[in-house]
């Protein structure tokens, strides 16, 4: 019975020693460092110039585009006149090419 108790104690002690030694071997020690350095400085040992951080800016979704469109009978408070409808026949005449009506017209 004493032999099994000793074996268990030895196994438990060796297990605790291994577990307590692994974090320091892997650099995962939980002790607080005396100097605080950034991760690149800690790994590469040196000072690096400050890098400019990019910010992702959300577009302004509250822009009023109502003046871009005119629906004719809108009940909006703005009373902007509708743009004149272009005379396409006049445009084609100026170019010397009046479109003929399609088949069946």
From Swiss-Prot:
GO cellular component, one term: apoplast
Post-translational modification: The mature small signaling peptide is generated by proteolytic processing of the longer precursor.
Residues modified to Hydroxyproline: 99, 101
Gene Ontology MF, one: hormone activity
Keyword Nucleotide-binding: no
Induction: Induced by brassinosteroids (BR) but repressed by abscisic acid (ABA) and salicylic acid (SA).
Keyword Signal: yes
Source organism superkingdom: Eukaryota
Propeptide intervals in chain numbering: 30-90
Keyword terms of this UniProt record: Apoplast, Developmental protein, Hormone, Hydroxylation, Secreted, Signal
Gene Ontology annotations of biological process type: nitrate import; regulation of root development; response to abscisic acid; response to brassinosteroid; response to salicylic acid
Signal peptide start-end: 1-29
Ranges of biased composition (kind: Low complexity): 68-80
Chain positions covered by the region annotation Disordered: 68-105
Family (UniProt): Belongs to the C-terminally encoded plant signaling peptide (CEP) family.
Described function: Extracellular signaling peptide that may regulate primary root growth rate and systemic nitrogen (N)-demand signaling.
Record text on subunit structure and interactions: Interacts with CEP receptors (e.g. CEPR1 and CEPR2).
This protein's name: Precursor of CEP15
Species whose genome carries this gene: Arabidopsis thaliana (Mouse-ear cress)
